[in-house]
Regions:
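Intrinsically disordered, low-complexity segments enriched in serine/proline and basic residues
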Residues: 5, 11-15
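Compositionally biased, intrinsically disordered low-complexity segments enriched in Pro/Arg/Gln/His
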Residues: 22-25, 29-32
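Alpha/beta catalytic cores of nucleotide-metabolism and tRNA/nucleoside-modifying enzymes
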Residues: 35-62, 67, 73, 171-174, ...
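Glycine-rich, positively charged N-terminal anion/phosphate-binding segment
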Residues: 44-51, 55, 66-140
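Conserved, mostly hydrophobic/aromatic
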Residues: 63, 78, 90, 117, ...
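Non-cysteine beta-strand/loop elements that form the S-adenosyl-L-methionine
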Residues: 89, 141-150, 213-222, 280-283
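Conserved radical SAM core fold
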Residues: 93-98, 121-124, 147-162, 222-227
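Glycine-rich tight-turn/loop motif centered on a GG-T
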Residues: 151-168, 198-199, 227-240, 301-302
Length: 377
């Protein structure tokens, strides 16, 4: 009960602080955006791959970095559904890249472009070193996480707590920009408890802009850093699209991508009247077939929309290769469970790919049986 009372106070504070939104000087300079098609070959990227300069990725529609979800297998599946969506890795900490198995964290197949690496860290030198590694792996963008509210990352000065240290974030961005030629972007909240006024948000964005960042993905909620789980921080603080919209008005020269609570392509089209791009998180994972019409509705593609059964059929060779290399089918199929969402047999589909697949001597046969449930759809 004490937590609920404290949260209510924080939310009221947010509303009060943001009721009157001051304006900052406007700058009408715009930055061009390009749509880039992914490569079609299936080579696996490693740090032995030379840097491959690419046009800046288009951020009109992207899938958010999500821990335990947007791994390389998930991204391969999502790329089958949409050629133009910008995909993000899970957040990878600087310590993991510099002192762990770098290739395990960063390798991917070349079909996944356009692809961005999200980094977690707050040491400018370490972030610069990791950005160089990302460039060697031919990532199209490096993104700094300034939005994750979990206690675990806060203890290492990672994530949303950095909104309380805009000068440090600016130093981190500058160090990365000085180290690489690929774009460096930031994903952040509209504030944190104790630093949730619009003036403070503008101060944060302004300082990071001066460090050279030109693209900001804004999760339109504050983060409450004590007493709430990451899941609660995605739901309890209210969405404030108006604050993000004001930010775009006051910083027209910056690319502002909206994140938070977006569930349909109709929502996307509406928000694109105000913002430069939209980013979907949980909805894109739980209902992945939503991506199947992104290219047509948001990028003007005239290619036919892929069916659910076609997507699963195209995923089969990837799964077979992964299994042949010693992996398990569940590494891949766990990301496909939402493909039958809304159809009769959806529960059976999920059971076959999450339970039955472990019991059968030929798991690919179970995959083929599951495919019959969505055949022609």
């Amino acid at each position: 009960m004490a937590i609920v009372v404290r949260v209510d106070v924080e939310v009221v504070s947010l509303t009060t602080n943001l009721e009157k939104i001051p304006k900052t000087p406007e700058n009408t300079r715009k930055h061009p955006k390009m749509v880039k098609n992914p490569q079609t070959k299936m080579s696996l990227k490693t740090d032995l791959t030379p840097a491959n300069p690419r046009p800046e990725p288009c951020r009109r529609f992207s899938v958010a970095p999500m821990m335990d979800w947007t791994d390389r297998h998930c991204r391969h599946f999502l790329r089958l559904l949409s050629r133009h969506t910008l995909l993000y890795t899970e957040m990878v900490t600087t310590g993991a890249l510099l002192h762990g198995d770098t290739d395990r964290f960063l390798r991917y197949d070349d079909t996944q472009h356009p692809l961005a690496l999200q980094l977690g860290g707050s040491n400018p030198a370490d972030l610069a070193a990791c950005a160089k590694i990302a460039e060697r792996y031919a990532y199209d963008e490096v993104n700094l996480n300034v939005g994750c509210p979990s206690d675990r990352v806060q203890n290492n000065m990672i994530g949303a707590c950095l909104m309380g240290h805009p000068a440090l974030v600016a130093d981190c961005v500058k160090a990365m920009r000085d180290a690489v030629s690929i774009p460096v972007t930031v994903k952040h909240r509209i504030g944190i408890n104790g630093r949730d006024s619009y003036a403070q948000l503008c101060d944060f964005v302004g300082q990071v802009r001066e460090a050279g960042c030109r693209s900001f993905t804004v999760h339109a909620r504050i983060a409450i850093l004590e007493g709430l789980s990451p899941k609660e921080n995605r739901d309890i603080p209210p969405l404030r699209y108006d604050v993000a919209a004001q930010l775009k008005k006051d910083f027209p020269e910056l690319e502002i991508v909206l994140n938070g609570g977006i569930k349909t392509l109709a929502d996307c089209q509406a928000h694109l009247q105000t913002f430069d791009g939209v980013m979907l998180g949980r909805e894109a994972y739980h209902n992945p077939y939503l991506l199947a019409e992104v290219d047509q509705q948001l990028f003007g593609s005239t290619a036919p929309v892929i069916t659910r059964s076609e997507a699963l059929e195209q995923l089969r060779p990837y799964i077979a290769r992964h299994v042949a290399e010693g992996g398990t089918m569940h590494h891949v199929t766990r990301h496909v469970l939402g493909l039958a969402l809304g159809f009769p047999g959806a529960r059976k589909f999920r059971q076959m790919l999450s339970v039955d697949i472990h019991k059968h001597p030929d798991p690919l046969q179970v995959l083929d049986q599951a495919a019959l449930i969505i055949e022609g759809r």
